[in-house]
Amino acid sequence: MTASAHDSHSGTGSSALATIDWRGRPIRIEHQWIAPERTAAPLVVFLHEGLGSVAMWKDFPTQLCNAGGFRGLVFSRPAYGRSTPRDADETWDVDFMHRQAHEVLPALFDVLGIREQPWLFGHSDGGSISLLYAAHAPDCVAGLVVLAPHLFVEDLTITNIEAAREAYLNTDLPKKLGRYHDDADSAFWGWNRIWLHPPFRQWNIEAELDAIRCPVLAVQGVDDEYGTLQQIRGIASRVHRTQLLELPDCGHSPHKDQPQQVIDATVSFINQWRQP
């Protein structure tokens, strides 16, 4: 895989496009820098959920980076946000998160000139991709903050993804998602169909976590509608330097339900482990 510069550091507040070569074609990647002038500060890279994008994070990444004095990079994966949409006939395979971690993320870092060890902040699918990246390239990451990541597929997850499918077909959910994606169908059906694909029920990344060497802060809401606490507890059982934060009165999106607790815990965690 190769990567080529289409745009680069764009400053705070506006998104830009970078181009990588993936799956044999050029793919635009929407991205936005936060406080790039903080050149000596830790870099936090934000990886969104299965239906997320740059815009869907809203101002949370900026709030977090300002609280900790960090730099930030927010981006939309292929098929999401302003990034290149998924072709209508393109289906994702069971290894779709592995490909994001092993192929897309390194290519994006290359085209943007990221040579340091970033901190990855991933939510849901983005949390799983963060874990897979750290397992695949353990020397290339400083640490992980993962919110409601998936290690394996649970009945609870499938039930609520089936409910999301019905909502997309029968409510104004497509219109709502259209505010955050150039092609809402690209974002929704790529995610929904692979999660409901019967072979995906066997997807499990627990054994791969043994290769992770960096510290991990794993956060999950007690009321998470897409997974049980066995997901983050599974990380702690395999990764030595794991801190768990189990939040009451919190669902699948801790950064929305309990933003200040997530910000405080993340700033403390990064400051604890950052290199002087």
Positions of the model-derived regions?
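Conserved HGGG/HGGXW glycine-rich cap/lid loop of the alpha/beta-hydrolase fold
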Residues: 34-87
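Short beta-strand/loop motif that positions the catalytic acidic residue
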Residues: 212, 218-220
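Catalytic histidine neighborhood in serine/cysteine hydrolases
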Residues: 237-253
